[in-house]
Amino acid sequence: MSADASTNSNASLDEKNLNITSEAEIKNEDVTAEPVLSTVLSPNGKIVYISDKVDEAMKLAEEAKEIEVTPEEDRKLRWKIDYCMFPLMCILYAVQFMDKISTSSAAVMGLRTDLKMHGDQYSWVTSAFYFGYLFMNLGPVQFIFQRTSHMSKMLAVFIVIWGMLLALHAAPTVKYPSFIVLRVLLGCAESVVTPCFTIITAQYWKTEEQFTRVSIWFGMNGLGSILINAIAYGVYIHQDSYAIKGWRTLFVITGVITIFIGILIFLWIPDDPSKARFLSKREKLMVVQRIRSNQQGFGNHEIKKYQIIEALKDVRTWLYFLFTVSSNIPNGGISSFMSILLNSDFGYSSKETLLMGLPTGAVELVGCPLFGILAVYAANKKIPFWKYKLSWAIFAAVLALIASCMLGFATNSKKARLAGAYLWYISPVSFICVLSNISANSSGYSKKWTVSSINLVAYAAANLAGPQTFIAKQAPKYHGAKVAMVVCYAVMIVLLSILLIVNLRENKRRDKIAAERGFPEETENLEFSDLTDFENPNFRYTL
């Protein structure tokens, strides 16, 4: 290549503000075979080619660019989205948790006796659910839901199916083997809710709003716990009035409720903001404008292999994975065995156990949203350390560690152990923070789905293993399970601290690079180009 050609090449690149000094650097990049709309320089110094396979929000981006949204309009739109989307989302999340832990209440209502369970067989009832959950998140969930343009409709179908499966738990012909099969299938059906909700949250709310929203809908697990204990108590005290056993009646009731909620989801929740019947044309454009700062849009229905590979190479993916394993081994055990602990370890009767389970849900229902609100307040006030959401996750993990120690080692005080059991229900705050991190910090639709799926594989595997820490021969104290909880929460604190440091350092590095590059001409609608967080120079990680 001649010197003149080299000079011309460099000049053309400088005109694009790419800060590339030689044509060789372009040749080192993998140029896509797809039509190239534009190029951008990633934070790692690589040229990124933007193809025509962009985010769904790009269809509205040009039109949205022309409108101006006042702070008052933005506030009203946010409240409208909250009002129209959130109640049904919260109810569904409460119902899915109610269904998931229904076996815990059924266990003290005669389930174990009627199905002739012995030894560790009850532990496998819970683990079976997570075998199905694990299988679906190994790939099927991502393939089905990323490829479809009707995400909420597909979600509704899965909800109705799991409602039917739950009602089938009550069939008089169900024995232990068939009950296990039903639990596996139920896990398959329920596995879709959390990843779908993570995507929906990113579609409608800004990154700074997402932690509070995830805290609220995930905190509805507490409402689900209250509902299942209340329904179970009502069934238990009137069980002589039914033609079938009380625990079978419980599954029929919860199954019918779930089917009804699935129908409502199908009729009301839109597939993405552009299809929301409760939003006017202008409001749909306003949604596009308000999520520009997220550096991501509604999603892309093509599965991009390079984004999957990037997700596998991202250290955050594996920090999420290890954290989720650590946080959900205790969760898998306590969710299934809390009623049994109250009954056998604390000495409450079956009737008292169902009542004593109510406060556990109240702690989670109030505590999780409260942490989300406090985190937003601290961020707005820029309070050192506490302005980071991950700081609140670390604090919640410390509380969970204290609660586990109280539950496991306060052997001389029943009240202290009971207080620890209740305080433990604040522990989901840490997991909520990680879910909101995945929603906000994993950019690129295929990458987001991949990271979410890997995280939920860890969730399923840990919840599958959790009940196995409750060894039958250690009943009623289950000392080994309590020690495992303490170890897991100690590991969680370390992992969350590492995640915070990694994101802080990367944001500082990107700020430094941006300052050195100056202010190049902005690539139009870059945030809706379906770029990953590794590719987008404007992306900063939520802390």
Swiss-Prot record:
Cross-referenced SUPFAM superfamilies: MFS general substrate transporter (SSF103473)
Subcellular location: Membrane
Residue numbers on the Extracellular membrane side: 98-123, 172-178, 238-248, 343-352, 412-417, 473-482
Species the sequence originates in: Saccharomyces cerevisiae (strain ATCC 204508 / S288c)
Stretches assigned to the Cytoplasmic side: 1-80, 146-154, 201-213, 270-317, 378-389, 436-453, 505-543
GO biological process annotation, one example: tripeptide transport
GO cellular component: cell periphery; fungal-type vacuole; plasma membrane
Molecular function per GO: allantoate transmembrane transporter activity; dipeptide transmembrane transporter activity
Keywords in alphabetical order: Membrane, Transmembrane, Transmembrane helix, Transport
Family: Belongs to the major facilitator superfamily. Allantoate permease family.
Membrane topology category: Multi-pass membrane protein
Record-given protein name: Allantoate permease
Its job: Component of the allantoate transport system.
